[in-house]
Amino acid sequence: MSSVFNIEREILPNTYLISFPKFIDERGTFLKIYNEDAFNEIGIKFNYKEEFISKSHKNVIRGMHFQKPPYEHSKIIWCSRGSVIDVLLDIRTGDNYGMVESIILNEDDNYLIFIPTGIAHGFKSLENNSELIYKTSSIYSKAHDEGILWNSFDYDWNNNDKPIISSRDLNHIGFKD
């Protein structure tokens, strides 16, 4: 059984779409989502401290989330059920500040995203019961939890239907504020 993880492309600087091993046989499917040694081999140093599962109805928008120092964290995310549009906003100082990219993740592909510190993260669920799994490199700290208002930066969420957004996410500051 191969344990190959491959960087498929750089989405934003140091933010990677990574393919992971997927094995299918008569019993079903087996996925290897994380292997510290394999990640080190492709140049990604990541030691996770916590893991979360987010289950969402269709048209739910969550984000744009990040944590402030000293609890900032890198993340590995993947979609284990349904499908999502994953949105990444660079909030690091420098030439890439304000860059935004998105990618569709779904349960049938074998991709995950490595998100470094300094990237605000959010997503829109494209199906009922979409499930996103997060591994983070630091423990969640409510006092350091921050966010950017989902519609305050240059990204088209394609909201033909009214999105479902928590009051917490609706009260985040605007990107330019």
What are these regions (language model features)?
Residues 1-108, 129, 136-177:
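Non-catalytic, conserved peripheral segments adjacent to functional cores
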